[in-house]
Swiss-Prot record:
Keywords: Ribonucleoprotein, Ribosomal protein, RNA-binding, rRNA-binding. Belongs to the bacterial ribosomal protein bS6 family. One of its GO terms (cellular component) is cytosolic small ribosomal subunit. HAMAP family: Ribosomal_bS6. One of its GO terms (biological process) is translation. The keyword Nucleotide-binding does not apply. It comes from the Bacteria. GO terms for molecular function: small ribosomal subunit rRNA binding; structural constituent of ribosome. This is Small ribosomal subunit protein bS6. InterPro entries: Ribosomal_bS6, Ribosomal_bS6_sf, Ribosomal_S6_plastid/chlpt, Transl_elong_EF1B/ribsomal_bS6. PANTHER family: MITOCHONDRIAL 28S RIBOSOMAL PROTEIN S6, SMALL RIBOSOMAL SUBUNIT PROTEIN BS6M. The lineage of its organism: Bacteria, Pseudomonadati, Pseudomonadota, Alphaproteobacteria, Rickettsiales.
């Protein structure tokens, strides 16, 4: 099965509890459509370069998903219907990045 990198931005007004609920809901949806969540990362509440739907910040999250193309089409369709998700990007990748991603690394400025 192919592996997909799925990054999404959730509304800034979500509490940590609501964000966890959103992530668990997306994970449950993956199981329901026959996909597997391989890895999940929360990157934090980050500023936007411009306002999106009256939000100046957003909760950035990354998921690595193993799924058939038809299942990913259904997943993307259902995520579009979720009002808490402002934007998302889904890319097909060859493998899952091992360890922490660059966004999870520490600031050494």
């Amino acid at each position: 099965m192919p592996i997909y990198e799925f990054a999404f931005i959730a509304q800034q007004g979500l509490t940590q509890y609501e964000l966890e609920g959103l992530s668990k809901g997306l994970s449950a949806l993956l199981v329901k459509i026959g996909a597997e969540l391989v890895k999940y990362e929360y990157w934090g509440l980050l500023d936007f370069a411009y306002s999106i739907a009256k939000n100046n910040k957003g909760h950035y999250c990354m998921m690595y998903i193993r799924a058939e193309p038809a299942a990913m089409d259904e997943f993307r369709r259902r995520v579009r219907l979720n009002e808490d998700v402002l934007r998302f990007l889904c890319l097909k990748v060859d493998k899952v990045c091992e360890g922490k991603s660059a966004m999870m690394g520490s600031d050494q400025d």
